[in-house]
A protein has these predicted regions:
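Structural signal for interior beta-strand "rungs" in well-ordered beta-sheet cores
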Residues: 3-184
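Short, intrinsically disordered, charge-balanced linker/junction segments flanking boundaries
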Residues: 185-191
């Protein structure tokens, strides 16, 4: 049976599985699905059309499934955020849903999002990836399996960071990053 704090707001169409915990002042909007054992700490928000698997932790002030930051987006569009299992979303993490009808921003399994990390619309974050404090993925980016973005790393729209790649902190890239490489600097790119 789900445990919902009396100050939390949960829309009647939201689906809460067994073992879900919703903390004080959290908000779960319409058409949200939450898998077994997932915990929303105080003040966490799951926006409409978000599906999140089992045993996830959504910490305070995280907003998952927010409207995409895309000027042409129509707020009535039924686009999605789909997150897998065993993920950790720490304080202030933001992940936007996709921009077009039926599309989704995708988060795999066992990802770790540190404070204030962000993924834009239509991003794909594969299994075991880590986003350190303040790192950001723009729209339509891909963060490969096991890749690590260090603190304050920016990945430009439509770029991908390959499997197992790791960044230097305070870096930015507007080019694709090869798998199993280290990258850093103001304009990191493939050599």
């Amino acid at each position: 049976m789900p445990k919902v704090h009396p100050t939390a707001i949960v829309h009647p169409t939201a689906v809460l599985s067994d073992g879900v915990e919703i903390g004080a002042y959290s908000i779960v909007e319409a058409d949200v699905v939450i898998g077994p054992g997932t915990v929303l700490r105080d003040h966490a928000i799951l926006r409409r059309y978000t599906t999140i698997g089992q045993n996830n932790i959504v910490d305070s002030y995280a907003v998952l499934g927010g409207l995409p930051q895309d000027l042409k987006f129509n707020p009535r569009t039924a686009s999605h955020l789909r997150a897998g299992d065993d993920n950790v979303f720490r304080e202030g993490v933001t992940i936007s849903r996709a921009t077009s009808e039926g599309e989704a921003t995708i988060v795999g399994n066992r990802t770790y999002w540190m404070t204030a990390a962000h993924a834009g619309h239509n991003a794909v974050v594969e299994d075991d990836a880590i986003l350190v404090n303040g790192s950001a993925l723009a729209g339509y980016t891909v963060l490969g399996r096991g890749a690590i973005l260090s603190a304050n790393v920016l990945v430009h729209q439509f770029c991908w960071v390959g499997e197992g790649a790791m960044s230097q902190g305070n870096s930015a890239t507007s080019m694709n990053i090869a798998p199993f490489t280290l990258f850093g600097g103001e304009q990191s790119c493939l050599p």
